[in-house]
Each structure stands twice: as structure tokens, then as C-alpha cells.
Curated annotation (Swiss-Prot):
[4Fe-4S] cluster 1 binds at C68, C73, C79, S308. PROSITE patterns: RADICAL_SAM. Belongs to the radical SAM superfamily. Lipoyl synthase family. The gene is lipA. SMART domains: Elp3 (SM00729). This is Lipoyl synthase. It holds the Pfam family LIAS_N. Binds 2 [4Fe-4S] clusters per subunit. One cluster is coordinated with 3 cysteines and an exchangeable S-adenosyl-L-methionine. It is found in: Cytoplasm. Its EC number is 2.8.1.8. It comes from Escherichia fergusonii (strain ATCC 35469 / DSM 13698 / CCUG 18766 / IAM 14443 / JCM 21226 / LMG 7866 / NBRC 102419 / NCTC 12128 / CDC 0568-73). The keyword Nucleus does not apply. [4Fe-4S] cluster 2 binds at C94, C98, C101. The keyword Transferase applies.
Length: 321
């Protein structure tokens, strides 16, 4: 019998080490079993990386993190080259260990009390007009990190009064009342929480999370602030059917959500959940039409769409694929 991994505080556990801690075991994907990417999934990198390196340098200088880097987002080059980034607060170590996600798992260190000020100054220096703030899950904190979100929102607005702020929050599992008391007192301009996938495979895809809990979080925030758009994102290609995705979309509408993102899941490493299928651009267009017919005011659906991909354009209703 193998000994359990003893996690050291502040150490990042990735790939095989991270997956070893998941109750629902994932079989490592052999190279020959990997699905070949279709032509529409090929990414063209920008010829000039000056802007990309500049944003990375600004992050490093202030000890900040972007989910773009930590989660190995395929759109990193495009977004950084356009001067946009999704900031990840509360460190780069997540207390959850979802097998689709490339963010490191482990025992995180205490939150940086100076992070809100450093974040606000960096955003002001970059002259951003729209910013997305997300975080790792922090099940070790009594409020799940909600107060830190609020402190960041306050600090950003002090430095950049006209900025629009979107928060992409974790589920605050077991801490919803406390978290919502804080977040509804200092609300963002868009409140985002991702369902990620369909209930049938939730235990496999999001161990430690609960589908109905996430729906309730979105609903309760909307009840407190009906004037603020709520948003959620889904990945496809993990073994769900299009019909199941459409039913999740109906659930989101029943819980007051008006903004939707839908994108292709990509396997970060062979230790993560494998891609079961690549969804064609035509299928994404069909699901977008379904979403708009249901009453979503915004629906960004396409192979490379991610929750915060061109979030400023999404919020304006400009088509994003």
C-alpha cells in the first residue's frame, strides 16, 4: 500500500502528483490514444511577442498571477498581445484538484494583504478599461476568499474609477452565506461563476463541487442584485452530449443567468482527463442559436472561447468565437 502524499505548504502539485490525490482515478492517456486536433483547433502565434513579455514582466514585478498562465490557456498569446489578462488573486495554489484544470493543487500560503493595492496599481498602469478578477479555490479560508475579492474591487475602483470589473468566483462551498454577504455589499459589474460541465459527469470532472450548489450561488447573487448580469461557462468534449449541454443552459436561465460562454475542452497533460471529442464550429453555432432563443442576452460559443476570453467584448454583446 503506497503512502499518502504529505503536502508541504506553498508547494505546487501538478500533473501526476495532483491526480494521485483525486478520489475518482483517471487513466493516463497514452500518446497513441490522443485524439488528433482538427484543423480548426490550430493556433497561430503572433510574430511579435513584445506586448506578451511586457505583461508577464508587469505581473512578475508585482508578484501577481494570471489564470492565463497558471491554467495554460490556449488564448494566452492572443489576449496578452492585445493587452488584456485575467488576474488570479489569492495565490497560485488551489485547494481543489479538478482533473480538467492545470492550476496547481496544494496547501496555499496565507493571502497577501498587499495584493489588492498591487493589483490596483498594475491595472491603473496598464490603463485597462475592463478587467476580470478570478481566484483559486481557498477552502482553507473561513469566507472562501470573498473578503479578498471585495478588497480588490474596492482598491481597483479607487485607482480606476471608470473601470468595469468582472469577477469569476469559486463556489464558496460550505461558505455561501458568509461569502454572499460580503460580495453583495461590494458587487462587481458582472458576476461570473462557471458550471463547467453537465451533472451526469460532475463527480468525475469537478470532485468537491456540487452542480446545484453552483446554480444556487448564481441565483442568490442575482436575487440580491437583479441589475447586475450573471454569467457562467461550460466546456464541451468531456463525454457529455449536446442535449445535456442544452439542458444545463436551460437550468442557467431558470436561475437568472443571462450571459453564457461555451468552449472546447483541451487536455493540459496526459495525466488530465482526455478529450472525448472535438466539437465543430457549426455545432457551436447551433448551440449559440439555442442559447439566444432561450433568452441569454450574450452567448459566446466557439472552440477557443473561454470564460474570460475577450470578456470586454462579451459584455458589450459583440460576437466572440
Amino acid at each position: 500500500m503506497s503512502k499518502p502524499i504529505v503536502m508541504e505548504r506553498g508547494v505546487k502539485y501538478r500533473d501526476a502528483d495532483k491526480m494521485a490525490l483525486i478520489p475518482v482515478k483517471n487513466v493516463v492517456t497514452e500518446r497513441e490514444a490522443l485524439l488528433r486536433k482538427p484543423e480548426w483547433m490550430k493556433i497561430k502565434l503572433p510574430a511579435d511577442s513584445t506586448r506578451i513579455q511586457g505583461i508577464k514582466a508587469a505581473m512578475r514585478k508585482n508578484g501577481l498571477h494570471s489564470v492565463c498562465e497558471e491554467a495554460s490557456c490556449p488564448n494566452l498569446a492572443e489576449c496578452f498581445n492585445h493587452g488584456t489578462a485575467t488576474f488570479m488573486i489569492l495565490g497560485a495554489i488551489c485547494t481543489r484538484r479538478c482533473p480538467f484544470c492545470d492550476v496547481a493543487h496544494g496547501r496555499p500560503v496565507a493571502p497577501d494583504a498587499n495584493e489588492p493595492v498591487k493589483l490596483a496599481q498594475t491595472i491603473a498602469d496598464m490603463a485597462l478599461r475592463y478587467v476580470v478578477i478570478t481566484s483559486v479555490d481557498r477552502d482553507d479560508l473561513r469566507d472562501g476568499g470573498a473578503q479578498h475579492f471585495a478588497d480588490c474591487i474596492t482598491a481597483i475602483r479607487e485607482k480606476s474609477p471608470s473601470i468595469k470589473i468582472e469577477t469569476l468566483v469559486p463556489d464558496f462551498r460550505g461558505r455561501m452565506d458568509r461569502a454572499l454577504d460580503i460580495l453583495t455589499a461590494t458587487p462587481p459589474d458582472v458576476f461570473n461563476h462557471n458550471l463547467e460541465n453537465v451533472p451526469r459527469i460532475y463527480r468525475q470532472v469537478r470532485p468537491g463541487a456540487d452542480y446545484n450548489w453552483s446554480l444556487k450561488l448564481l441565483e442568490r447573487f442575482k436575487e440580491a442584485h437583479p441589475e447586475i448580469p450573471t454569467k457562467s461557462g461550460l466546456m464541451v468534449g468531456l463525454g457529455e452530449t449536446n442535449e445535456e449541454i442544452i439542458e444545463v443552459m436551460r437550468d442557467l436561465r431558470r436561475h437568472g443567468v443571462t450571459m453564457l460562454t461555451l468552449g472546447q475542452y483541451l487536455q493540459p497533460s496526459r495525466h488530465h482527463l482526455p478529450v472525448q471529442r472535438y466539437v465543430s464550429p457549426d455545432e457551436f453555432e447551433e448551440m449559440k442559436a439555442e442559447a439566444l432563443a432561450m433568452g441569454f442576452t450574450h452567448a459566446a460559443c466557439g472552440p477557443f472561447v473561454r470564460s474570460s476570453y475577450h470578456a470586454d467584448l462579451q459584455a458589450k454583446g459583440i460576437e466572440v468565437k
